[in-house]
């Protein structure tokens, strides 16, 4: 299969053997200046719940803390618990690139991530002292982000501060949308999360809009080599990286169109 429509048809054909995975920021939620004010677009929560009841696996894989995802993507606390519990296990909420997941309605961090907690705490404290005025420091528990969206002219200064702290703390630095992120040097990414969750599925879709989503595209490429039908959906924006848009099998314009696409995947009896 080559076209996006054909791959969508493969997902719809047998939901019991298919999985749908998505990024959060820029995909299910619009990009905003203050990350704490980000919320999913209208319809996103309901469509995820409907898909989770129909498909073998549905997930949101994000750089956000898993607790944030649980708070804002659960239809309500009890429904979120039901959809993420060990018995059902269909709705995967993976935060911090897989360093945290929601299990039985509770956030659980990996042992490896917990060992890096003190290092991150010290790094966050130093960065808050050293970051130039206009660059905000967001501690996420097991990662820390320097945001310069409101002052793009400070990008070089923010990079220098992030690089210095990464070297000092043995953390890995990644570049995001008008931000730099430091996280533990662990072999965990959106790609590893998707690869593990989708290993036994016959059709898999991932939707994303940023550099961090490319590892999930890589995972889908590996699954395709193993015989799975895969669909890489890129979400267009002024800040979406060219590589992601070039590799996408299907392109949509923003979170509202993402929800429309996801709604089209709900079975008629869903």
Enumerate the language-model features and the residues they cover:
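Non-catalytic pre-domain segments flanking phosphatase-related domains
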Residues: 1-24, 28-36, 43-46, 50-53, ...
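Hydrophobic helix-cap positions at the C-terminus of alpha-helices
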Residues: 11, 51, 76, 127-130, ...
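Mg2+-dependent phosphoryl-transfer enzymes with acidic/Ser/Thr/Gly-rich catalytic loops
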Residues: 15, 191-270
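The start of beta-strands in P-loop NTPase/AAA+ ATPase cores
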Residues: 18-20, 91, 204
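Conserved Rossmann-like nucleotide-cofactor binding loop
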Residues: 27, 66, 212
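Short, hinge-like loop/turn segments at secondary-structure boundaries
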Residues: 76-79, 109-112, 154-155, 192, ...
